[in-house]
C-alpha cells in the first residue's frame, strides 16, 4: 500500500472508532510479529514464502482475507505475466491448509479493468 492509502485508512478508522494498525513496509524485509493480528488482508501480492509467517502472525481466531491472480489471468490483458506471480489451481488453499477455510473460490470475476482470473480465500486461525 502507498503511504497515501495508509493515511486514508487511518482517517477512516478514526472516524469509525476502529483500532487499525496499517503499516507501510517492504515485505521482503519486514518480519510479521507472532499472534498479533485479528485480520490480515492480502490482495494481488503473491510471495509464497509469506504463507507461514502470515499464519503465525494471526491471533487465535484471527481471519485471513486473500485474493491473487491465477495462471488463467495470462489470457487477459492485464495483471502479472510472469507465472511465478500467479497461483495454480488449488494452490492458495494448500498454502493455508493449517487454517480453517470459511470461503474458497477460484474462477473469473469482473474487475475494474475487465475480467480477472483469481483465487480467493477467507480463512480463520483455529483457537
Explain the meaning of each model-derived region.
Residues 2-4:
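Conserved SAM/SAH-binding beta-strand->alpha-helix loop
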Residues 45-59:
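A short, conserved alpha-helix within the catalytic core of class I
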Residues 83-104, 119-120:
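Short alpha-helix
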Amino acid at each position: 500500500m502507498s503511504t497515501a492509502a495508509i493515511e486514508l485508512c487511518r482517517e477512516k478508522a478514526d472516524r469509525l472508532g476502529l483500532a487499525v494498525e496499517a503499516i507501510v513496509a517492504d515485505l521482503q524485509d519486514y518480519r510479521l510479529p507472532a499472534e498479533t493480528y485479528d485480520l490480515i488482508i492480502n490482495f494481488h501480492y503473491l510471495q509464497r514464502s509469506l504463507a507461514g509467517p502470515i499464519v503465525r502472525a494471526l491471533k487465535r481466531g484471527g481471519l485471513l482475507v486473500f485474493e491473487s491472480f491465477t495462471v488463467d489471468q495470462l489470457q487477459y490483458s492485464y495483471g502479472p505475466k510472469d507465472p511465478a506471480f500467479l497461483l495454480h489451481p488449488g494452490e492458495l488453499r494448500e498454502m493455508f491448509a493449517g487454517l480453517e477455510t470459511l470461503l474458497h473460490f477460484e474462477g473469473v470475476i469482473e474487475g475494474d479493468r475487465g475480467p480477472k482470473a483469481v483465487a480467493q480465500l477467507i480463512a480463520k486461525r483455529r483457537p
